[in-house]
Amino acid sequence: GSIVQPPLQRLKSIDQWQSVATQIRALPEVNVVSPAANGSALVVRGNASRAITVVGVEPELYFRIVPMPEKIVHGTARITINDILIGTELANDLGVSVGDKLRVTSASGSANTLSVTGIFDLGNKAANARTTMMALRSAQSLLGLQGGVSALDVTVHDVYGAELVAHRITKLTGVEADSWIKTNEQFFTAIS
């Protein structure tokens, strides 16, 4: 039950995302609102390069939605500004382990060298090959989203009320909200 998001063609930040997040957080049905900067990038190690999906998050919020620490098989789920978490497939593919450095470059031309602090298993081969996770600030600068976010990940208390909440959020903020079914809770993403 992992979330695999379609790659965004062009990244634009949600307008006034801080105030949108505050409005969503104020809804009694809402449990967690986690800002994210997600996009496509290339990871380079020696002469090997792979296409990846970058998920930039604030761990103290995002880990309440997706319990990454439980999915770590090597290392820890630490994400500071210089860290990256990668999946088991990508790690095997590139021959990297915890402590190794990876160069990540994006379509916008930005590049960053990050240390692998943790290797995770999302229970899905494709996700383990493509998904990488880093600090929100690292992803923002890499993806050319300075100070912006491409998504707000939201969980609600009541699984069955999620569609309704998504609809309310769209009406309230003008931000489109999509529902995702995830394991036993409803999880959705608001995108601009």
How would you describe each model-predicted region?
Residues 36-39, 48-57, 73-137:
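Hydrophobic secondary-structure segments that place a key small or acidic residue at a functional site
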Residues 1-51:
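Hydrophobic, regular-secondary-structure patches
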Residues 28-31, 94, 147, 173:
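Structural motif
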Residues 8-15, 44-46, 62-67, 80-81, ...:
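Solvent-exposed, non-transmembrane alpha-helical starts
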Residues 107-192:
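Mechanotransmission and gating elements of multispan inner-membrane complexes involved in transport
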